[in-house]
Amino acid sequence: MSKVWLITGAGRGLGVDIANAALEAGHNVVATGRNTDRVARALGKSADLLVVKLDITKPTDAESAVKASVDKFGRIDVLVNNAANFYAGFFEELLPEQMERQLSTSLVGPMNVTRAVLPVMRKQRSGLIITISSTAGLIGFEFGTAYAASKFGVEGWTCFRHPS
């Protein structure tokens, strides 16, 4: 049975690979990104594909993307929280705005999308949420303070989200 996959950050890198793999396996895909032209160019056209604008830092965008997904395909079976960014540098040289953007995109963003998807999955009484993290969430690295902080947060959030 085909599933409906909602994938964030589907305009490049791993997001493109995940979306293509799901499409090739016969699933329906809602591919999201801030730049829908980039997402559409990366994935091409398919009756099984819906491209939706989504800035994961905006809860209203997440709600709209979920609504568009359900309107088109009737359900969401798999959420892949893939979108992220990366600010590198010595901690004291990173601007406060860069730290905020890093945490907003890589930590709060997946929370926004998951919060919007959960009511759909609870109503269906099924669903799978995959949140892409990094080894930076387990062990920090030079010049990666902002990124590691966001990924340590993701690791903690996903560990304690499971029972609820």
Language-model-derived ranges and their functions:
Residues 11-13:
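Conserved glycine-rich cofactor-binding loop
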Residues 25-40:
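Conserved glycine-rich Rossmann-like NAD(P)H-binding loop of the short-chain dehydrogenase/reductase
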Residues 54-64, 96-97:
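The beta1-alpha1 cofactor-binding region of Rossmann-like NAD(H)/NADP(H)-dependent oxidoreductases
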Residues 90-91, 95-100:
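Substrate-binding pocket helix/loop in short-chain dehydrogenase/reductase
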Residues 92, 139-146:
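Active-site loop immediately N-terminal to the catalytic Tyr-X3-Lys motif
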Residues 134:
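Residue(s) in the substrate-gating loop at a strand-loop-helix junction
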